[in-house]
């Protein structure tokens, strides 16, 4: 599986809303496999298709917290709960981090690689990773959400 080039801030694909996957083909599955390989090679915890130059609604996540690899097609957040602030970084924004307020718990709905709908209830770091990657599908980068001094009261 080839490792894909990770697009960096300034690339227009990172600021575009990704298109839904309408059919899961061999090409789709190959893209997912290559995204997984790229994420692990880059030592990331998540990757969205736009980060490798593909404007499709696909994410892969593995926070290393024991839940294993999660691959989602057309993911969407359907429920949120609570708020939390935490430092974030991004493979597409190298060398920069910042504190971001996000929901502490989320329920995410999407399709697995077999086309079956799945719902995942996540909290903590996994919930944050889902929100970060789904933001990528909407052309949003974490730096757009970094809190400024005085905004940290949640």
From Swiss-Prot:
SUPFAM superfamilies: Peptide deformylase (SSF56420). Keywords: Hydrolase, Iron, Metal-binding, Protein biosynthesis. It catalyses: N-terminal N-formyl-L-methionyl-[peptide] + H2O = N-terminal L-methionyl-[peptide] + formate. Binds 1 Fe(2+) ion. Fe cation binds at residues 90, 132, 136. Gene3D superfamilies: Peptide deformylase. The active site is at residue 133. CDD domains: Pep_deformylase. Its EC number is 3.5.1.88. Its cofactor is Fe(2+). GO terms for molecular function: metal ion binding; peptide deformylase activity. One of its GO terms (biological process) is co-translational protein modification. The keyword ATP-binding does not apply. Removes the formyl group from the N-terminal Met of newly synthesized proteins. Requires at least a dipeptide for an efficient rate of reaction. N-terminal L-methionine is a prerequisite for activity but the enzyme has broad specificity at other positions. NCBIfam families: pept_deformyl (TIGR00079), PRK00150.1-3 (NF001159). PANTHER family: PEPTIDE DEFORMYLASE. Belongs to the polypeptide deformylase family. This is Peptide deformylase. The gene is def.
């Amino acid at each position: 599986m080839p490792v894909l080039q990770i697009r960096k801030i300034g690339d227009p694909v990172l600021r575009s809303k990704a298109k839904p996957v309408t059919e899961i083909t061999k090409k789709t599955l190959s893209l997912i496999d290559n995204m997984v390989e790229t994420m692990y090679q880059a030592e990331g915890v998540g990757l969205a298709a736009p980060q490798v130059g593909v404007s499709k609604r696909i994410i892969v996540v593995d926070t290393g917290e024991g839940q294993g690899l999660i691959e989602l097609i057309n993911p969407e957040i359907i429920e949120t709960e609570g708020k939390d602030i935490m430092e974030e970084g991004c493979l597409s924004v190298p060398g920069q981090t910042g504190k971001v307020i996000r929901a502490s718990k989320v329920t995410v709905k999407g399709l697995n690689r077999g086309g079956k709908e799945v719902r995942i209830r996540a909290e903590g770091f996994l919930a944050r990773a889902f929100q970060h990657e789904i933001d990528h599908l909407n052309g949003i980068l974490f730096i757009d959400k970094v809190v400024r001094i005085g905004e940290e009261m949640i």
